[in-house]
Amino acid sequence: MKNSLLLNRYRKQALTWFILPAVIIAGWIYPPAGFLLLLCMIGAVGLSFFSGRSWCDWMCPRGAFFDLLFQNPRQSKPVPSWLHSKKLRAFMLGLIFIVLGTQLYLSWGDLYGMGMAFVRLLTITTLIGIVLAVKVHPRGWCHICPMGTLASWFGKGKLPLYIHEKCTGCGLCSKACPMGLTPHRDKETGEFTDPDCIKCGSCTSACPRTALSFTKTVTAQKAA
């Protein structure tokens, strides 16, 4: 069951990751292709009202790209504190929207110019994300991604991870988390509500006690 959950996630990511390089390449050839980036932006924020940052799991091509190409479960890296900085995230959000907004304003009415604004943004931020993935953490960019930040704000408290009392606090769930989060530290409260949780289920698959679930009643039944 656990392996099937991970395999299912892998298969979904295998279907979406290639969209990232495909859109970048297509965008430089045919700039209007850059408008596809809007779908990812709208999807991430729209879905957050119902299930938090779940879009960032496998539906986001860039998130899938980073997981498949840079994630190594045997060498999990801790997420540095500066990537959790609210000021840095707010700065990135403001910077991206100002830069993108300015380019769209200057090229308004020109589909090629407006499309290229999205292509440039996608290309530059992906390169930054690759550097962070190699040097800092595979999902480093995801911690400062403007859409991810908005999704974490709007999706706060949505679809929490329930922790049954039989949790031993072994920390295997935290080691398996692609975002570098630490669910086991909230065992006393019985809920993990970090807004950066992408609801991927890696933690539930890693738990030897089956004490974690995104469905409260199911958790209690499994861990009983």
List each model region and its residues.
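Non-ligating segments of multi-cofactor redox enzymes
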Residues: 1-187, 195-198, 202-224
